[in-house]
Amino acid sequence: MKQIEVVAAIIRKGDKIFASQRGYGDWKDWWEFPGGKMEAGETPEEALKREIREELSTEISVDKYLCTVEYDYPKFHLTMHCYICSLLTEALHLNEHEAAKWLTKNELENVRWLPADLKVIQELKCLKENANDGSRGDPC
């Protein structure tokens, strides 16, 4: 099975988390955390910053590692490294996605997430309610 390794940015602003809706491909209209494939020689942090510049025309800081998700899609195996991030600039422009939302933890289940991203939602629910540093609450 084909292997794909990607990075995903869980961008937080206050108590909200950024979600983007795919505008292309087999999973068009499904929601995901922005990010993409790592290029040869890139660290996950470098790949995240590049992908967010490409997809959203903004700059982020990569604050803390959250989790790595392994998921088997019908056509490939996905390894997704997820990081808590914050915006360094306020302006966002959707270059590849058709829509975006800032969601609270309670609103995370209101959109149709890609299957691999659902595993990230589970991790996010384990974070301390008011912690901005990504520290965990009770074990999942």
Protein language model features and the residues they cover:
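Conserved N-terminal beta-strand and adjoining loop/helix that marks the start
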Residues: 1-17, 37
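The catalytic Nudix box helix
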Residues: 33-65, 104
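Conserved hydrophobic "DFG−1" position in protein kinase catalytic cores
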Residues: 11-12, 19, 85-87, 102
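Charged phosphate-binding loop/patch that engages nucleotide di/tri-phosphates or the phosphate backbone
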Residues: 116-140
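NUDIX/MutT-family hydrolases
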Residues: 84, 93-124
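A conserved beta-turn-beta hairpin within the catalytic core of GNAT-like acetyltransferases
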Residues: 26-30
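Active-site-adjacent beta-strand/loop module that shapes the phosphate/pyrophosphate-binding cleft
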Residues: 59, 69-91, 99-101
